[in-house]
Swiss-Prot record:
Pathway given in the UniProt record: Pyrimidine metabolism; UMP biosynthesis via de novo pathway; UMP from orotate: step 2/2
Designated name of the protein: Orotidine 5'-phosphate decarboxylase
Assembly mode: Homodimer.
Upper classification of the organism: Bacteria, Bacillati, Bacillota, Bacilli, Lactobacillales
GO cellular component, one term: cytosol
Any one Gene Ontology molecular-function term assigned to this protein's record: orotidine-5'-phosphate decarboxylase activity
A GO BP entry: 'de novo' pyrimidine nucleobase biosynthetic process
Role summary: Catalyzes the decarboxylation of orotidine 5'-monophosphate (OMP) to uridine 5'-monophosphate (UMP).
Enzyme Commission number(s) from the entry: 4.1.1.23
């Protein structure tokens, strides 16, 4: 099922910065928030407990990639935090992804990263030595992710349709790199607007700087949410 709330990437360096940002929103508004490496390493597991205590949903974006037993053990710990979604690198392999699923259990969504949205085809071929097209690599990883029993993948919106065709229509496609028209793309090579992401079939979208660095973050969030959901029935 699609998520009507854009996921806000909390790319902040400290707990206090997050508190200041969230204080801008009405206390009763339930948000979907992404906690990435920078914030998690700075604030620790307490940041997740804090956000959940405020009634928000949490996507813990740590992109685990290690031997299967280590990932399984780490996922057991994350499951106790009450996260709503977390992820691994598909490049870790099917056995690692299965171990992650077992460790996390079924109460949270588990998705995999295929290729980072900052990766171009030339970079993939040169540095990863994967001599296929970028799309072929993404489809391969998506199939392996489905095989491992995960809920979906992180992918660019340009890849959503081919991934759902290669797996199944209910396979989650979470799309970062979302930018409203006219906003600088930053360091991500493959980007799309919220309306385009909806039309192409994305299930979740992640938006960071266009909200967190906006002059009015609350207005920016609602404008993006309106664009994302404008054609929903």
């Amino acid at each position: 099922m699609r998520e009507h709330r854009p996921i806000i990437a909390l790319d902040f360096p400290s707990f206090e910065a997050v508190k200041e940002f969230l204080a801008l929103f009405p206390a009763e508004e339930s948000l979907y928030l992404k906690v990435g490496m920078e914030l998690y390493y700075a604030a620790g597991p307490e940041i997740v407990s804090y956000l959940k205590g405020l009634g928000h949903s949490v996507f813990l974006d740590l992109k685990l990639h290690d031997i299967p037993n280590t990932v399984k053990s780490a996922m057991k710990v994350l499951s106790q935090l009450g996260v709503d979604m977390t992820n691994v690198h598909a490049a870790g392999g099917v056995e690692m992804m299965k171990a992650a699923r077992e460790g996390l259990g079924s109460q949270a969504k588990l998705i995999a990263v295929t290729q980072l949205t900052s990766t171009s085809e030339a970079q993939m071929q040169e540095f990863q030595n994967i001599q296929t097209s970028l799309q072929e690599s993404v489809i391969h990883y998506a199939k392996k992710t489905a095989e491992a029993g995960l809920d979906g993948v992180v992918c660019s919106a340009q890849e959503v349709q081919v991934i759902k065709q290669a797996t199944n229509p209910d396979f989650i496609c979470l799309t970062p790199g979302i930018r409203p028209a006219g906003v600088a793309v930053g360091d991500q090579k493959r980007v799309m607007t919220p309306a385009d992401a909806y039309q192409i079939g994305s299930d979740y979208i992640v938006v960071g700087r266009p909200i967190t660095q906006a002059e009015d973050p609350v207005a920016a969030y609602h404008a993006i949410k309106d664009e994302w959901t404008q054609d929903w029935n």
